[in-house]
C-alpha cells in the first residue's frame, strides 16, 4: 500500500509540467483543487478550477501557452488582480486573485493607475500589442478580490464565444482515485395547487454502492434530490461532482455533466436546488429533476425532466450514477412499488402555497411611510410571500421559492431635512441571523423619496450614516523612522455605507495605494515612492458612499545616505 501511494505521489509530482503537448501547468507545483469546474456556488456555477497554493501567496504563475495579453484588471472585488491571455488554438486562459502582476505587465498597469489616479482599473489590449510566451511568468498567486483564501482561480474559455471550458477536459491533470461521496437522498412528492413534500431516505453504503434497504411503496408524481461531494487525492476539500445520471427501469430520465458552461447558466442556478431547503434549512440539495422549464447549456435533453409517476402495481428500479472526471463512480439504487392507497411514506417537510404571488402579475403594497413593489417575473413560480410593517420597519420573511429578480422599495423621506441629514439618510437592513450588523442598501433619492431596487428578504428601515471612515496606521507611527519598512499599512474601515473613494499623497504627490476591503487594509509600497526626501508627509483622504470624509496625516522620516 505504501509503495502504491509513493507511485501515485511520484506520478503527480512529475506530471505537473506535462499537462498536455501544448499547455503547461500555470503553477510550479502539482495541481491540487479546492474548487472544481461547475461547482455550485451561492450565485453561480464555478467557471474555472481553484488551484491550491500551499496555503500561501506569492507562488509564480506562468502562461500555459503562447498568446497575446488581451485584458488585465485590478478590482477590490470579483477576480481581484486578473490576467487574460488569448492563445492561438482558439482558447483564452484566465488567471485570477493574483497578488501582483509580472514586472512587464505591472509597468503597464501602474502607468494607467497613475494617469487616472485610481487603484481599480481595467485595460484591454489589441491583438499582438503584448506578446506572451509559453511558461512566461505573468504574476504571482494571491488572495485579492472576492477570494476567501490564497489560491489561483484558473479558467479556460472558448475565445470565439467566451464559453468557459472545463480545464480537466483540456489536458490539465489532477490525481483522483476517490469516487464521489453521497450523503443523503431526498424524495419529493408533488401535489396539486403548487404543493410538494420532501423526505430524506436512509442509505446503506457498501464501498461505492449506496442502497435503500426497504422497498418504497407509494403513488403519485415524484422527483429526487441529493447532497454529496467529490474529493481528489492529497486534498481534503469537498468539491463538486462532475456528472450525475438518473435512470428509471433502465431509461435515462435526467442527466448532466460539466464539460462547459455559459455565463447565463449561473443566473438560474437556484432552479437546480431545493431553494427552500437551502435558504431556510441551510441544506444545499441538488435536484435531479426540473419542475420549471428552463434552459441550461449543460443539461441533456430528457423526455421527462427527471419527474416520474408511480402508479398501482408497477415497479420502478431507480439508479443514480455519480461520476468524477477521472471516471470514479458511485451508485445509488432503490426500488419503488406503486400502490392504490395513500402512500405510507412520512414526509417531514410540506410546502403549500395557499395564496401565492403569481409571476405573471405585478403587486404593490402600500404602508404609511413606504411602498413595496413586486414586479412581474420577480419569481420563477407562484410563491407565498410574508411581510409585515411595524415600528417603521418592513420585515420581508425568508423566500421559499427562488427569486428571478429583486423586489423594489421606496421610503418617504421626512420633510424639512437639512442638507447634511439629507445626504446621510439611507436605507438600512438587518439580515436574518445577524441582528447586530446593519447592512447599507444603495438607494436613489428623488422627489422626497429614496428608492431601492433588487432587494430580498430581511428587515428594512431608514437610518443615517453619520460616521466617516476610520483610519489607523498598522506598522508605523507619526514622527518615526520608516527605513526598515518596505510597505506602509493602514487599517481603514467604514461602519455602514462603505468606502467610495480615497486618495493618498506623499509630499504633495499622488501615490498609488492598494485597497483590500475584506481585510479593511490599505497599503503603500515604497517601491512606488519617487521622492528622495528624508521627510515624508503622508496625507490620506477617504470618503464613504454618503459623502462622510476623514483625513489622515503622518510625518515620517528616512535616513538618506549620500
Where do the protein language model's features map onto the residues?
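Surface-exposed, glycine-biased beta-strand/turn segments
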Residues: 18-92, 99-101, 119-128, 133-151, ...
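Long, low-complexity serine/threonine/glycine- and acidic-rich segments characteristic of extracellular
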Residues: 103, 175, 188-342, 495-562
Amino acid at each position: 500500500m505504501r509503495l502504491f501511494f509513493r507511485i501515485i505521489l511520484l506520478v503527480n509530482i512529475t506530471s505537473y509540467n506535462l499537462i498536455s503537448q501544448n499547455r503547461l501547468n500555470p503553477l510550479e507545483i502539482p495541481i491540487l483543487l479546492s474548487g472544481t469546474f461547475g461547482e455550485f456556488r451561492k450565485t453561480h456555477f464555478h467557471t474555472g478550477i481553484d488551484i491550491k497554493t500551499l496555503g500561501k501567496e506569492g507562488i509564480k504563475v506562468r502562461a500555459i501557452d503562447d498568446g497575446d495579453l488581451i485584458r488585465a484588471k485590478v478590482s477590490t472585488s470579483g477576480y481581484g488582480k486578473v490576467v487574460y491571455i488569448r492563445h492561438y488554438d482558439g482558447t483564452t486562459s484566465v488567471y485570477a486573485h493574483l497578488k501582483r502582476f509580472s514586472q512587464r505587465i505591472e509597468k503597464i498597469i501602474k502607468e494607467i493607475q497613475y494617469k487616472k489616479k485610481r487603484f481599480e482599473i481595467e485595460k484591454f489590449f489589441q491583438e499582438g500589442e503584448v506578446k506572451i510566451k509559453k511558461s512566461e511568468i505573468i504574476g504571482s498567486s494571491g488572495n485579492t478580490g472576492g477570494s476567501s483564501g490564497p489560491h489561483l482561480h484558473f479558467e479556460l474559455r472558448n475565445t470565439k464565444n467566451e464559453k468557459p471550458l472545463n480545464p480537466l477536459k483540456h489536458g490539465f491533470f489532477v490525481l483522483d482515485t476517490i469516487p464521489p461521496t453521497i450523503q443523503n437522498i431526498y424524495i419529493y412528492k408533488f401535489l396539486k395547487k403548487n404543493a410538494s413534500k420532501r423526505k430524506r431516505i436512509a442509505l446503506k453504503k457498501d464501498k461505492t454502492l449506496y442502497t435503500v434497504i426497504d422497498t418504497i411503496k407509494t403513488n403519485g408524481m415524484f422527483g429526487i434530490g441529493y447532497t454529496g461531494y467529490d474529493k481528489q487525492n492529497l486534498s481534503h476539500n469537498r468539491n463538486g461532482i462532475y456528472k450525475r445520471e438518473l435512470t428509471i427501469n433502465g431509461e435515462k430520465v435526467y442527466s448532466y455533466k460539466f464539460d462547459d458552461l455559459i455565463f447565463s447558466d449561473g443566473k438560474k442556478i437556484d432552479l437546480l436546488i431545493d431553494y427552500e431547503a437551502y435558504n431556510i434549512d441551510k441544506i444545499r440539495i441538488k435536484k435531479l429533476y426540473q419542475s420549471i422549464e428552463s434552459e441550461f447549456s449543460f443539461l441533456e435533453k430528457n423526455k421527462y425532466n427527471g419527474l416520474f409517476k408511480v402508479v398501482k402495481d408497477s415497479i420502478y428500479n431507480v439508479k443514480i450514477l455519480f461520476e468524477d472526471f477521472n471516471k470514479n463512480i458511485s451508485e445509488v439504487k432503490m426500488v419503488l412499488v406503486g400502490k392504490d392507497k395513500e402512500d405510507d411514506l412520512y414526509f417531514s417537510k410540506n410546502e403549500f402555497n395557499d395564496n401565492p404571488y403569481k409571476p405573471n402579475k405585478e403587486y404593490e403594497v402600500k404602508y404609511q411611510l413606504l411602498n413595496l413593489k413586486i414586479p412581474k417575473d420577480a419569481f420563477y413560480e407562484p410563491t407565498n410571500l410574508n411581510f409585515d410593517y411595524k415600528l417603521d420597519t418592513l420585515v420581508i420573511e425568508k423566500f421559499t421559492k427562488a427569486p428571478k429578480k429583486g423586489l423594489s422599495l421606496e421610503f418617504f423621506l421626512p420633510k424639512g431635512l437639512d442638507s447634511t441629514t439629507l445626504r446621510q439618510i439611507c436605507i438600512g437592513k438587518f439580515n436574518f441571523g445577524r441582528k447586530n450588523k446593519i447592512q447599507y442598501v444603495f438607494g436613489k433619492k428623488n422627489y422626497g423619496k429614496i428608492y431601492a431596487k433588487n432587494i430580498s428578504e430581511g428587515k428594512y428601515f431608514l437610518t443615517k450614516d453619520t460616521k466617516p471612515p476610520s483610519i489607523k496606521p498598522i506598522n508605523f507611527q507619526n514622527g518615526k523612522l520608516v527605513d526598515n519598512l518596505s510597505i506602509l499599512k493602514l487599517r481603514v474601515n467604514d461602519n455602514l455605507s462603505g468606502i467610495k473613494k480615497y486618495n493618498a499623497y506623499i509630499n504633495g504627490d499622488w501615490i498609488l495605494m492598494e485597497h483590500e476591503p475584506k481585510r479593511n487594509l490599505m497599503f503603500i509600497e515604497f517601491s512606488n515612492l519617487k521622492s528622495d526626501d528624508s521627510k515624508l508627509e503622508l496625507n490620506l483622504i477617504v470618503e464613504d458612499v454618503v459623502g462622510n470624509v476623514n483625513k489622515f496625516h503622518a510625518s515620517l522620516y528616512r535616513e538618506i545616505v549620500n
